[in-house]
Amino acid sequence: MTKQKIAVLGPGSWGTALAQVLNDNGHEVRLWGNVVEQIEEINTNHTNQRYFKDITLDSKIKAYTNLEEAINNVDSILFVVPTKVTRLVAKQVANLLKHKVVIMHASKGLEPGTHERLSTILEEEISEQYRSDIVVVSGPSHAEEAIVRDITLITAASKDIEAAKYVQKLFSNHYFRLYTNTDVVGVETAGALKNIIAVGAGALHGLGYGDNAKAAIITRGLAEITRLGVQLGADPLTFSGLSGVGDLIVTGTSVHSRNWRAGDALGRGEKLEDIEKNMGMVIEGISTTKVAYEIAQNLNVYMPITEAIYKSIYEGANIKDSILDMMSNEFRSENEWH
């Protein structure tokens, strides 16, 4: 692939790691953020200490606070901003674009209020005149491992398979590999909802439960994620792939996962506001729990784990009681899809 110019919007842990992957592949990478001190640090010291204490970035990676400069004459734009500001940043990009680009996103969540997936937001805010079909980059991927060039396999999903193949070539190298998919609904739904199950898995650990319980919540969590995804129009096979069970395993079993750590702290009795303050990072699983619960209620989809976590976070229920209540739910077949 010829050298591409790429703007990466969001210099958080994942945005920074993906910027390095793209830089390793010989592309011109521009990181954009709105924290002046962080941008200056990246440009001057070639570090991003808030997220990576011992990592030095390539000096060719340039960082910007001016969005217009960051996206000027680029071939593609990668959104890696928190869900809650995706629409705002997309509006800003739409007002500045002067030519057609490939639009990608690598965030995982659902918009509060509208319940929309992130690709839908980007489609609504950025005119087709200036973009390809949206490409979703998602899968089992800790930034802490990708940044040290550990082997990572994820998915590039788009309704336009050629756009997905472009992104596949853009990122893939000897340690980072992408597989294509056209099931955008499934890939985005899996990526968002696995954060809820990771909170639950972390809570089980914090409460002192063992591997049996953790395996159960991950497996039954996958079942309810799939149930909702299918109701939304997803291909059930997607949930057995990298962006489904793969992402759920890596997020639901690892201390690298901020959602798992948040659940662990909840299980140990910490208050949510203290957890969010101490972590200093967005915990997408918290807001996604509310959105997923509301969607499930609207569509009458059975999601007991999501409901239990929702009641603990938003209704003040005891997390242990909520989990134990699930053990007395009505008996069901393992393969029920409603």
UniProtKB/Swiss-Prot annotation:
Can the keyword Thylakoid be found in this entry's annotation?
no
Cite the entry's keywords alphabetically: Cytoplasm, Lipid biosynthesis, Lipid metabolism, NAD, NADP, Nucleotide-binding, Oxidoreductase, Phospholipid biosynthesis, Phospholipid metabolism
> Which Gene3D superfamilies does the UniProt record give?
N-(1-d-carboxylethyl)-l-norvaline Dehydrogenase, domain 2 (1.10.1040.10), NAD(P)-binding Rossmann-like Domain (3.40.50.720)
Q: Kindly state which reaction or reactions the protein catalyses.
A: sn-glycerol 3-phosphate + NAD(+) = dihydroxyacetone phosphate + NADH + H(+); sn-glycerol 3-phosphate + NADP(+) = dihydroxyacetone phosphate + NADPH + H(+)
Q: List the disulfide bonds.
A: none
Citing just one GO molecular function, the answer is: NAD binding
Q: Where does sn-glycerol 3-phosphate bind?
A: 108, 139, 141, 194, 247, 257-259
Where it sits in the cell: the answer is: Cytoplasm
Q: So, what pathway does this thing act in?
A: Membrane lipid metabolism; glycerophospholipid metabolism
Q: Name one GO biological process term.
A: carbohydrate metabolic process
List ligand-binding residues for NADPH.
13-14, 108, 143, 258, 282, 284
Q: Which residues form the active site?
A: 194 (proton acceptor)
Q: Which InterPro entries match?
A: 6-PGluconate_DH-like_C_sf, 6PGD_dom2, G3P_DH_NAD-dep, G3P_DH_NAD-dep_C, G3P_DH_NAD-dep_N, NAD(P)-bd_dom_sf
Q: Which domain of life is it from?
A: Bacteria
Q: What is its EC number?
A: 1.1.1.94
Q: What GO terms fall under cellular component here?
A: cytosol
- Its top-level enzyme class, in one word, is oxidoreductase
What role does this protein play?
Answer: Catalyzes the reduction of the glycolytic intermediate dihydroxyacetone phosphate (DHAP) to sn-glycerol 3-phosphate (G3P), the key precursor for phospholipid synthesis.
Q: Which family does it belong to?
A: Belongs to the NAD-dependent glycerol-3-phosphate dehydrogenase family.
* Matching NCBIfam families: PRK00094.1-2, PRK00094.1-3, PRK00094.1-4
Protein name from the UniProt record? Glycerol-3-phosphate dehydrogenase [NAD(P)+]
